[in-house]
């Protein structure tokens, strides 16, 4: 339910962009994101930091896109957010005792320390890769292709990365947790 709720603003953005253009799509994205955050707060009692970062970025860059009727600002949102996620993971990897991934999931899953470091580094590289691909597509291909990529390409890449992560984690789970 929670993951589905996170994709509703993106799907609405895609549909409104295709039907009415960037200004209406940006406004729709902002409103849908704010509603999504309110629902998450009411249903789960809190808004996670990642959701707060994404929501703030949507409101900021989406407002600029709506005001100037220009998609470029939302293109930069994706680049900035993925760069920020990658940087945060890298800083946690090398600057703190535990990588961020371990801090987030370590209570639910018991894994060797080096596995946590590999996962953290893997996701940092993934976000960096998403940032670079987004940067290329946003600058060298059409706006329509970028919207398609943002809606379906990044979603597909994220699902694949999540699946690979799950398979990787499974190999290192204690036998009792594998069942």
Swiss-Prot record:
The chain crosses the membrane at residues 11-31, 52-69, 71-91, 121-141, 149-169. Keywords: Cell inner membrane, Cell membrane, Membrane, Transmembrane, Transmembrane helix. It is found in: Cell inner membrane. InterPro entries: YciB (IPR006008). The keyword Transmembrane applies. The keyword Transmembrane helix applies. Pfam families: IspA (PF04279). It is a multi-pass membrane protein. GO terms for cellular component: plasma membrane. NCBIfam families: ispZ, PRK00259.1-2. Plays a role in cell envelope biogenesis, maintenance of cell envelope integrity and membrane homeostasis. This is Inner membrane-spanning protein YciB. It comes from Histophilus somni (strain 2336) (Haemophilus somnus). The lineage of its organism: Bacteria, Pseudomonadati, Pseudomonadota, Gammaproteobacteria, Pasteurellales. The gene is yciB.
